[in-house]
UniProtKB/Swiss-Prot annotation:
It comes from the Bacteria. This is UPF0210 protein Teth514_2074. Homodimer. InterPro entries: UPF0210. It comes from Thermoanaerobacter sp. (strain X514). Transmembrane segments: none annotated. It holds the Pfam family DUF711. HAMAP family: UPF0210. Belongs to the UPF0210 family. PANTHER family: UPF0210 PROTEIN MJ1665, UPF0210 PROTEIN SPR0218.
Length: 455
C-alpha cells in the first residue's frame, strides 16, 4: 500500500501535536481452571497462570510502540470475575490473599493495572459474592494495581437494590482506608449496570464468562485529534458537517488501534478480541471531551445544549469507528471522567457543570458518572442513591452505565484533590443534601422494565 506524503505528515501530527495514542492493550485471561478448594492453591494457580500468559505482553507492546511510533500508554490485564472462582474463600483474609496474588502477578509482568476483582450480583448474592464485596475496601487499600467492579443491574434483571445499598457503604469505607491518598482506593472501584465482558478500560475491566481462553482487547484515545479537526471548521459549519468530520477522524483513530491490536494478538499467539472505540481524555490541555463540545459552539461544557452536543459526538465516533474494525466492543463511545479531563475540571470550577448535568449527559454517552470527587462526609445512603439513579438510566436505555465516585475524606465542596497520573485532579463537587435514606433502606429488586412500550 502506498501512502501520500500528506497522509504520513497527518499521522505524525496526530501523534506529536494532537496526542493520538493507544490508551490500552488489555489481555483478558480465563481463570476458571484455577479453581481449588484450598485458597493457597487457588492463589498460586492464579499467579502462575497470569505470569505465564502475560509474560511477553509489555515487551510486545513496547516493540509495537517503537515500530509504529504510536504511544501505547497502558498495558493491562483483565481476569475472570474472582467471585466466580473463589467460593472456597471463607473470610476477608482469604480474599486478601487472592487480591495480593493478582497484585503480585501484575507487578511481575509489569502491567499498570489488573481488573477482575469483581462480582456479578444483578439478581442476587451468593455467599462468595458477599464475602468478596465486603473484602473490597481492604483489598484495594492493600494493593497497588488491583481494580474492582460490581455489576448490580441489567436491563433484563432489573436493579439489585440490596447491592446498591451495600456498595454505598463499600465505597465510603474504601475511600476512608486510603484517606492518606485522598481516598484513591475508590478510584479503583466501579459499580455497573449492563457491564460488558470485553471492556479493556479500568477500573471496570473483567474477562467475561463468554470469552475465550485468552484475548487481546484494545482501547484507543484521540480527543485531541478530533478537537484539532473541528477547530478547522468555521462557525457557519452545520451539524451535518461536524458529524462528518468526526466520523472521518474517528475512523483514522480506530484504524490505528485495529492494526496494533491484531499485531499484538499475533505476536502473543492469542486471539484478537475487540477494539473499544471510546474517546478517553487525559488531564493534558487539549486532550479533552469538554473542549470538543465547546468547539461545537458551547461557551462552557455544562451549558444548555451540552447533552445534545455529546449525543452528536458519541454517535459520530461510533459511526466512523465501526468502519475501521470487524470486532467493535467494550464501552465504545465518549468518556466524561471529571478528574481526567482538563475541560471538565474547568467547567466544574466555573460553576457550569454539576453532578445533575453529568447525570443527564450519561444518558447519551459511553458510560456514566466517572472520577467525581465529592465531600468526604457524604452519607453512604446518598452515594447509593446516586448509584441507583445511574443504574436506572442504563437499565431503561439498554446501555452500559457506571459510577466511579470518590468521597474524599476530610474534604468539602470547593476543595481540590490530586490523584496523579492519568487519574488527574479534581474539584470536590456539590452533592444534593436532601436525604434518600428511607428509599435506599427498602431493599429488594427494582423489576426489569417492559421493553415493548419504549416511551
Amino acid at each position: 500500500m502506498r501512502f501520500a506524503f500528506d497522509e504520513i505528515e497527518e499521522t505524525i501530527r496526530m501523534v506529536q501535536a494532537e496526542k493520538l495514542d493507544i490508551r490500552t492493550i488489555t489481555m483478558g485471561i480465563n481463570l476458571r481452571d484455577c479453581v481449588s478448594d484450598n485458597v493457597e492453591t487457588l492463589s498460586n494457580k492464579i499467579y502462575d497462570k497470569i505470569t505465564k500468559k502475560a509474560k511477553n505482553l509489555v515487551k510486545v507492546a513496547n516493540d509495537l510502540e517503537s515500530e509504529f511510533g504510536i504511544p501505547i500508554v497502558n498495558k493491562r490485564i483483565s481476569v475472570t470475575p474472582i467471585a466466580l472462582i473463589s467460593e472456597s474463600a471463607k473470610s476477608t483474609e482469604d480474599f486478601i490473599k487472592i487480591a495480593k496474588a493478582l497484585d503480585a502477578a501484575a507487578k511481575e509482568v509489569g502491567v499498570n493495572f489488573i481488573g477482575g476483582y469483581s462480582a456479578l450480583v444483578h439478581k442476587g448474592f451468593t455467599d462468595g459474592d458477599l464475602r468478596l464485596i465486603n473484602s473490597i475496601p481492604e483489598a484495594l487499600s492493600s494493593t497497588e494495581r488491583v481494580c474492582s467492579s460490581i455489576n448490580v443491574a441489567t436491563t433484563k434483571a432489573g436493579i439489585n437494590m440490596d447491592a446498591v445499598a451495600l456498595m454505598g457503604k463499600i465505597i465510603k469505607k474504601t475511600a476512608e482506608l486510603t484517606k492518606d491518598k485522598d481516598g484513591i482506593g475508590a478510584a479503583k472501584l466501579v459499580v455497573f449496570c449492563n457491564a460488558p465482558g470485553d471492556n479493556p478500560f479500568m477500573a471496570g475491566a473483567f474477562h467475561g464468562v463468554g470469552e475465550g481462553e485468552c484475548v487481546i482487547n484494545v482501547g484507543v484515545s484521540g480527543p485531541g485529534v478530533i478537537l484539532a479537526a473541528l477547530s478547522k471548521l468555521d462557525n457557519k459549519a452545520d451539524f451535518g458537517q461536524i458529524s462528518e468530520i468526526i466520523k472521518k477522524t474517528s475512523f483514522k483513530i480506530a484504524r490505528a488501534g485495529e492494526l496494533i491490536g491484531r499485531l499484538a494478538a499475533e505476536r502473543l499467539n492469542t486471539s484478537f478480541g475487540i477494539l473499544d472505540l471510546s474517546l478517553a481524555p487525559t488531564p493534558e490541555i487539549g486532550d479533552s471531551i469538554a473542549n470538543i463540545l465547546e468547539a461545537m459552539g458551547l461557551s462552557k461544557c455544562g451549558a444548555p445544549g451540552t447533552t445534545a452536543a455529546l449525543a452528536l459526538l458519541n454517535d459520530a465516533v461510533k459511526k466512523g469507528g465501526v468502519m475501521a474494525s470487524s470486532y467493535v466492543g467494550g464501552l465504545s463511545g465518549a468518556f466524561i471522567p471529571v478528574s481526567e479531563d482538563a475541560g471538565m475540571i474547568s467547567a466544574v470550577e466555573a460553576g457550569a457543570l454539576s453532578i445533575e448535568k453529568l447525570e443527564a449527559m450519561t444518558c447519551v454517552c459511553s458510560v456514566g458518572l466517572d472520577m467525581i470527587a465529592i465531600p468526604g462526609d457524604t452519607p453512604a445512603e446518598t452515594i447509593s442513591a446516586i448509584i441507583a439513579d445511574e443504574m436506572a438510566i442504563g437499565m431503561i436505555n439498554k446501555k452500559t452505565t457506571a459510577v466511579r465516585i470518590i468521597p474524599v475524606p476530610g474534604k468539602k465542596e470547593g476543595d481540590h484533590v490530586e490523584f496523579g497520573g492519568l487519574l488527574g485532579h479534581a474539584p470536590v463537587m456539590k452533592v444534593n443534601n436532601f436525604s434518600a435514606d428511607t428509599f435506599i433502606k427498602r431493599g429488594g429488586r427494582i423489576p426489569a422494565p417492559l421493553q415493548s412500550l419504549n416511551n
